[in-house]
């Protein structure tokens, strides 16, 4: 329901302000384009409602904005959000596997991979889900962090640290 997604935007705004320290979090609705009228009935209704709020609503955002830093809170329904999250989680694994494969038989590529080590580790910290551990379940009475079903020890530890800071 549109009302639920508007509530998600409000909770995301509060989380970004009070936990992430963002003064005016930029909020967007995930859609298939940034142009007016894009999306399905649900996203168009949510867009119309959020446009009338005091939130710093910037309009529709696309999948490419998930990790861009251009938006602080991306609003979508749970199914779409879960699919987007799983794509993002797989991104690092895919990039890392391709880099290793390409460096396998080529001495120049191996040298470049070695020289890029620090940058690759920084990229991994940004894209590896275990670095974050989990995501807070907002709107419940208490602290709750949801972890990936295949979380490793590092992810669980980071989820516990996240929960302790909520």
Specify the residue positions occupied by each region the protein language model found:
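A generic short-segment signal for beta-strand/edge and adjacent turn/coil regions
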Residues: 1, 28, 42-45, 105-106, ...
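Glycine-rich phosphate/diphosphate-binding loop of Rossmann-like nucleotide-binding domains
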Residues: 2-63
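Glycine-rich, charged/polar anion/phosphate-binding loops
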Residues: 13-15, 58-70, 79, 129-132
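Solvent-exposed alpha-helices and their adjacent loops that cap or buttress functional pockets
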Residues: 19-24, 48-52, 65-68, 126-130, ...
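Glycine-rich phosphate/nucleotide-binding loop
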Residues: 70-74, 78-166
